[in-house]
């Protein structure tokens, strides 16, 4: 794999145990409650017609809105370590557009939650828009990560 095009991470201290925070982080259908961009989504069904539930290999389709535009962002779960780590890749492992990772560490006050983002490959819209489009997208990611962390914190500290 080549070096990421862009990376960003941010953290928040949450006055709740890791198992509570992990339960929220892995509830992707709830991200619309916290994100400044995501407004919901759904688990894709497997060959038998059963929707995913967040296991490694399951796929979720996030519905995002920003600046008057709406789009779907399919992701594939690539790592799930209870109460410690949860990661997924936008576009699935084939397209490998962006890696999103949540790391949980026990802390004196409860849990330190870190959300990290790696832009690995440019999707067509960012390729067409050049560096200004990439810069705009990275600004949006920083805002979205902060909003998501604060939203999860508020939810976890108010008993989910």
What is each residue range found by the language model?
Residues 89-147, 152:
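Beta-strand/loop substructures that line and gate deep hydrophobic ligand-binding cavities in soluble
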């Amino acid at each position: 794999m080549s070096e990421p095009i862009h990376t960003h991470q941010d953290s928040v201290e949450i006055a709740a145990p890791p198992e509570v925070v992990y339960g929220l982080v892995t509830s992707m259908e709830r991200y619309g409650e916290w994100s400044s961009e995501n407004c919901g989504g759904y688990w894709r069904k497997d060959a038998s017609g059963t929707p995913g539930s967040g296991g490694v290999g399951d796929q979720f389709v996030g519905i995002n809105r920003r600046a008057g535009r709406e789009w779907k962002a399919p992701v594939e779960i690539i790592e799930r370590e209870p109460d410690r780590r949860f990661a997924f890749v936008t576009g699935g492992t084939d397209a490998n557009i962006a890696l999103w990772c949540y790391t949980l560490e026990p802390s004196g006050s409860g849990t330190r939650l870190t959300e990290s983002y790696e832009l690995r490959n440019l999707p067509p819209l960012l390729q067409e828009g050049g560096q200004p489009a990439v810069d705009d997208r990275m600004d949006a990611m920083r805002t979205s990560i902060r909003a998501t962390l604060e939203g999860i914190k508020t939810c976890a500290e108010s008993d989910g």
